[in-house]
Structure formats: C-alpha cells, structure tokens
C-alpha cells in the first residue's frame, strides 16, 4: 500500500505513516508543509497575514462546497460555474445526498484559521478553542513515528507552492 499527494493530500500521506501500519510501504509527498508554524503561519518569523486570510477564504469555500467562489479565487473564468454541483454525494442517491448535507452542516462550525492563527504569537501557543498546539498539526512533530514506520518517502518540492522549499529541506 502506498499514498501520494500534493499539498494537503501530501501532508495526509505523510500523517498516514504515524500509524505505522505494516501494509503501508511508501508515500510520495509533493509540495507539502513540514512545520505549520514556520512553513505557513510565520515564515521567517513574520506573520503571513495575506496567506492566512486567503487560506481561510479557500477553506470557507471548500467547507460550503462553493465551486463558484473557488473558481473565481484562482482566476478561472468558467461559463455557468454557478451551476456546478461541487462534491458528489457518495453511495446511493438518497443516503448520499443526506450525508453530504450533514457534512456541509458540520463544516459550518470549522474554525477560522485566519483569526485563530493571529493569536499564535509564539511557537508553542496553546489554542483553547482547538485544545491543541500548532506543532501537533505538523508532520515534524511526529518524526519519530514517521521514521519508525519503515516506509519509503519520496518527497520533492520547489517554488511551485509557496514556502515549502524549506519544508522539503527540513524534512531531512
């Protein structure tokens, strides 16, 4: 079993190794963060307000299954984008639509990464709202478990996705 992905899905592939499941033999990580604090929120020690605000807007559109807003944000001019359905329901039509509606309702309560990240003035800041620290949502925090998985890791990055050049280097 293997996993691969870009950006979010790349981080998910890397987090898969934390479980140390013996069936997982390799992951391919492309353009993915390693340390959320230094790679995204405070690159170079300076709060990256524009990125965090934009990321929050993208998250809001994803949480609402809003294809039109996402398309406009990335500069796509798609005719009739407003009628695109977004994420497809899974399973039979009745249960799938019901599950999708519930998921969209559940996602309305997701946190505001822009507002919450502004509170994190130092690396080990503890968020009461999420009952967690930023390092716990970073692959670097789980390096021992990732290495103990024994899985092969193929990671590459570059200028393509923001500040992840350092993430690629720091991973080693």
Located regions from the model:
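Alpha/beta-hydrolase fold nucleophile elbow
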Residues: 1-8
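Accessory cap/linker subdomain of secreted extracellular hydrolases
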Residues: 18-20, 25-149
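Short beta-strand/loop motif that positions the catalytic acidic residue
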Residues: 155-157
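Conserved alpha/beta-hydrolase "acid-adjacent" motif
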Residues: 162-169
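Solvent-exposed loop/turn segments at secondary-structure junctions
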Residues: 8-10, 34-36, 160-162
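Hydrolases whose catalytic domains are alpha/beta-hydrolase-1, hotdog thioesterase
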Residues: 12-16
């Amino acid at each position: 079993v293997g996993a691969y992905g870009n950006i979010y899905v790349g981080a998910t592939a890397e987090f898969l190794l934390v479980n140390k499941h013996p069936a997982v033999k390799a992951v391919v990580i492309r353009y993915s963060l390693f340390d959320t604090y230094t790679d995204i929120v405070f690159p170079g020690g300076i709060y990256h307000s524009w990125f965090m605000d934009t990321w929050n807007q993208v998250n809001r559109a994803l949480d609402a299954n809003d294809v039109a807003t996402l398309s406009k944000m990335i500069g796509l001019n798609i005719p009739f984008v407003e009628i695109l359905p977004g994420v497809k329901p899974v399973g039979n039509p009745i249960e799938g639509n019901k599950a999708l509606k519930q998921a969209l309702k559940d996602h309305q309560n997701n946190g505001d990464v822009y507002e919450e990240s502004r509170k994190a003035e130092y690396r080990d800041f503890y968020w009461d709202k999420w009952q967690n620290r930023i390092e716990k949502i970073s692959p670097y925090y789980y390096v021992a478990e990732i290495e103990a998985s024994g899985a092969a890791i193929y990671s590459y990055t570059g200028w393509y996705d923001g500040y992840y050049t350092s993430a690629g280097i720091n991973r080693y």
